[in-house]
């Protein structure tokens, strides 16, 4: 077993860097939350928006960190595709994206992905999901996926 390496990402939290990294997507967030949408508490007064497309409690689940300029609702068409392939699909936003509160920073993104993973693992366990859990990221989301690897 290897020890987890702790990284300090605070140097990347400079406003000039953040302005180039994070571009919260617009659109796609209208009306009240749908039944498969959740808010994940990650910090005091900060919640991350998510959407859980469920196929089956025995199916594997993909925890998906989307790309920059996107929000959870942009994956409303892709979730059912994963379901048709026999997988559950759990897509999450970042601070300041979609229904999420707070402001995005690299440090927050990297810390939040650990809290999100814990939340998803607990949610699956409490609700009787028995399939495996995989993590996937696209573009900006690949950093969170690699952080959890």
Functional labels for PLM-detected ranges:
Residues 137-147:
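Glycine-rich nucleophile elbow surrounding the catalytic serine of serine-hydrolase chemistry
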Residues 126-139:
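Alpha/beta-hydrolase fold nucleophile elbow
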Residues 104-126:
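Alpha/beta-hydrolase active-site loop
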Residues 82-101:
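Conserved alpha/beta-hydrolase
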Residues 1-41, 48-51:
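An N-terminal hydrophobic leader/cap segment in hydrolases
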Residues 59-67:
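Short beta-strand element of the alpha/beta-hydrolase
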Residues 77, 147-148:
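Active-site signature of alpha/beta-hydrolase-fold catalytic machinery across serine-
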Residues 67-81:
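The serine-hydrolase catalytic nucleophile loop
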